[in-house]
Amino acid sequence: MLRTFTTHSRLINELFANYLNTFFAFCELINNSLQANAKNIWIDIDYTSNDEALQPLVIKKMVIRDDGDGVYVDDINEKLLNIGTNNKEGGKGIGRFAAFQLGQTIEIETVGKSQAKNKSSKTIIPLNYKSFGKNINVSEVQVTTKEEIFDGILKTYYQVTIMDFYDDSITDSSPKKKIVDKLLKENLAAALFERYSLKIYNRDVKFYVNNHLIDPTDYIIGSPSIEDVSYIDKAGKNHVISFRYINLKHVENRKVFLTTTNAGIQTIASGFEFDAEWLSPKIGGWFIYINSDTLGSDLYRNISLDDMDENFKHYKAFLKNQSAHFFREKNKEFDNFLDKLKQDDYYPYKDKQSSSKSKIMLFDKLAFLVEDKYNLLNEKNKLREIIYPLIDRTISNRELDNVLKSVLKLNNKTLTQFNNLLNR
């Protein structure tokens, strides 16, 4: 069937490359699936293999399929071909075209249903970016669809197939179309978990990447901690801020994500890393998701200018203080150890000061890891007389690796962290 696009006075090139990078565009397609009440999302990507050395593209083909509501044939014009309209509450109505930021050729395939008619339909819509040009009147663009109608109610789905990804000749001048690291084979599952961890943990939706289920137990330690805290802004208005703390495997840093609700989906608006010298070396990696029903997303727009934006500066200080309070509670074992360590006769800095505060801090953390492994201080083991000076000398000589590997048997990531601390 021959159908025609409609739009509302927005340039096509603005609509089709409107996201910060290709991962954000990809996530917009995922958000569309979530808005359609999908419980399962399958992502199949044909990556260029190592033996295809002359292949200029990282990705040859991407298919995103969900088991959401789908679009019935009677709604195709309004819901799929009307660009820039608000088809979903709170949404821009352009998210389904985010695929054009990844590739030039798209095929939309959907099965929708009409309960009133007791019928289902299957529609296939082929699209190509070149059909739109840069300034063409969208109402002149026609597309030939394949449509079938069936009696009864079928299982609905929505599928987007993306092909003809952009090569360097295009991405050099349009960097927003370049495939970013989060979309690479080794990174995508973790990036999806970071973006949608609460939904994945709560099993609101299941993600499959090349037939592999993203399992929250592969990423999360224990259960998320949830805390609602009162915040008073610069104008004196009170807000309830929700903190969700998730302890992670295979991650060492702590990321704070500021989220907002967009079209009914909680999405990450911005973020920053949280760190403090007093943190225990066993504190591990955490994602901290922050949300408020009363704080608008406008507050997050100036995060890069937080020293100039007093409202955001005030809010960020509150977030850091609240996060610090949470980790202080987690830090008690380390704090109690330090109290004992600094009173110990074998503590090398009990009666003399080090020339470097960072050296003392590094020693304290290494001594804590030794204690955790060998229980020297708690059992008053006299090996402290040998071990503590050994740690002190290796720090002074900048030869940590041997002790860290042979005594503590730390992994390479932790070794790197301690060496970075040493080099401060």
Q: Where does each model-flagged region fall?
A:
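Interdomain "switch/hinge" adjacent to the Bergerat
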Residues: 1-5, 36-89, 116-288, 292-303
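Conserved short strand/loop->alpha-helix "switch" segment adjacent to the catalytic nucleotide/phosphoryl-transfer site
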Residues: 3-28
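Conserved ATP-binding N-box helix of the HATPase_c
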Residues: 19-49, 95-100
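Alpha-helical scaffold elements adjacent to nucleotide-binding pockets in ATP/GTP-utilizing enzyme cores
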Residues: 29, 75-79, 98-102, 187-191, ...
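Flexible nucleotide-binding loop
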Residues: 92
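Glycine-rich ATP-binding loops of the HATPase_c
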Residues: 105-111
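GHKL/Bergerat-fold ATPase module
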Residues: 244-408, 412-419
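Long, K/E/R/D-enriched contiguous segments that form extended
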Residues: 420-424
